[in-house]
Regions:
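Bacterial lipoprotein signal-peptidase II cleavage site
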Residues: 19-38
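C-terminal motif of bacterial Sec signal peptides marking the signal peptidase cleavage site
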Residues: 14-17
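N-terminal low-complexity, Pro/Thr/Ser-rich intrinsically disordered segments
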Residues: 34-71
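Short, glycine-/small- and polar/acidic-enriched structural segments
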Residues: 60-208, 217, 224-230
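Ligand-binding "clamshell"
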Residues: 132-144, 235-250, 309
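Secondary-structure end/capping motifs
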Residues: 271-352
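Pocket-lining segment of extracytoplasmic ligand-binding domains
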Residues: 213-304
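Conserved C-terminal helix/tail region of periplasmic/extracytoplasmic solute-binding proteins
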Residues: 342-375
Length: 375
């Protein structure tokens, strides 16, 4: 557990310095290539310069996006490499548009904001709330995988309960469990309790209003089990809590794989597909740059994520994995398993809580065209 706590604390430092757009010159098209003393030659040079400027203007137009600003939903205390360019505007420059970073506390809120027209791209939205929205008829598309993680999303029990895998059914009887509803944390909690033989009727399940609220309630002893993600998990462990099961056990024993996605309103993709592709391409570039020099970038990313005091969140061995575009398009992700995972999650939520019956086929909600358009 001590090793896992160290790993958990490692997950917390990656912060990004991102925000103001740096103005860049559109480029002088000067073609001062001749110093002839004859007027006729000067005129020819001027004509050539004019032609070069026209060519540059055309090039600028061909590389400009169909939008000047993109509203992107993201989570605080959830560090990702693209936050390295969030405050200094370098990510904006890589995309080719001003990025308005809008913080949200849940994936469900992200779906609602996209449907309301307030968000163009939801970055690192949980798969479960997205699947729930699709199951409810929302016209959204899953266009990429943001991050894969296991240990970063979990349930922490008060040490005084002495919960183990073997005694969970008895030790958790009558326990107060705080969790968000309708997201992957909720799905993992329900699946874990079923796997451990815990009767949900024996639990007092309270809806969380955010990870910080859950961590605070855990620290004061108002709840017995807190389920959250990111820095809130670290905070609860720092308060003396214990994991009921590790993320690795969720994967190996229950078959739960935890990852977040990139999603868009279908209408935004149809109108501004170039912007979606540019965002995904820039994110890939920033992921690669972080992987090449994480020690330099992690403190900057941590500051952007508001996690300076939580430790090196991205420094852990297995905290976050950022699949490449090639991997995302493969059968383990957008090529097949993602649609099946959405089906399974919706069915589980419907069976173990008050969810709607699954629609039967989620493949239509997955659109690989934007990733495929990246050269």
């Amino acid at each position: 557990m001590k090793k896992l706590l160290i790993l958990l604390m490692a997950l917390s430092l990656i912060a990004a310095a991102c925000g103001d757009d740096d103005d860049t010159d559109a480029g002088d098209a000067g073609s001062d290539s001749g110093s002839s003393s004859e007027p006729a030659d000067d005129s020819a040079d001027d004509d050539m310069a004019d032609d070069d400027m026209a060519d540059d203007d055309m090039a600028d137009e061909s590389h400009s996006l169909s939008v000047e600003e993109i509203n992107v939903a993201y989570f605080r205390e959830w560090p990702t490499p693209n936050q390295f360019g969030q405050e200094d505007g370098t990510f904006d420059e890589a995309v080719g548009a001003t990025i308005n970073w809008l913080p949200f506390s849940s994936g469900g809120e992200m779906s609602e904001a996209m449907l309301a027209g307030d968000v163009d791209i939801a970055y690192s939205q949980g798969l479960t709330p997205f699947a729930g929205a699709i199951n409810g008829g929302a016209d959204l598309k899953l266009v990429g995988i943001a991050v894969s993680y296991a240990e970063a999303d979990n349930c922490v029990a008060q040490e005084s309960l002495g919960v183990t895998r073997d005694n969970a059914a008895e030790a958790l009887a009558g326990a107060t469990v705080m969790t968000p509803f309708g997201n992957v944390t909720h799905y993992k909690m329900l699946s874990m309790m079923e796997f451990l033989g815990v009767d949900l009727a024996d639990l007092d399940i309270v809806q969380a209003e955010g990870g910080a609220t859950t961590a605070a309630a855990f620290e004061t002893g108002d709840i017995d089990v807190g389920c959250a993600f990111g820095g809130s998990v670290v905070t609860m462990l720092d308060s003396g809590g214990n994991l009921i099961m590790t993320g690795a056990e969720h994967e190996s024993d229950i078959g739960i794989f935890t990852y977040d996605i990139v999603s868009i309103p279908t209408s935004f993709g149809e109108a501004h597909g170039d912007a979606v592709t540019a965002f995904l391409a820039a994110t890939e570039d920033f992921n690669n740059a972080w992987a090449a020099d994480p020690d330099t970038q992690n403190p900057v990313i941590a500051a952007a994520a508001g996690m300076e005091d939580v430790g090196n969140f991205l420094g852990g061995e297995l905290w976050f994995d950022f699949p490449t575009i090639e991997d995302q398009l493969g059968p383990d992700w957008l090529g097949g398993n993602v649609a099946a995972a959405m089906q399974g999650q919706v069915e589980t939520l419907n069976e173990l809580s008050d969810g709607d019956p699954a629609i039967g086929d989620f493949a239509g909600a997955v659109d690989t065209s934007y990733l495929e358009a990246i050269g």
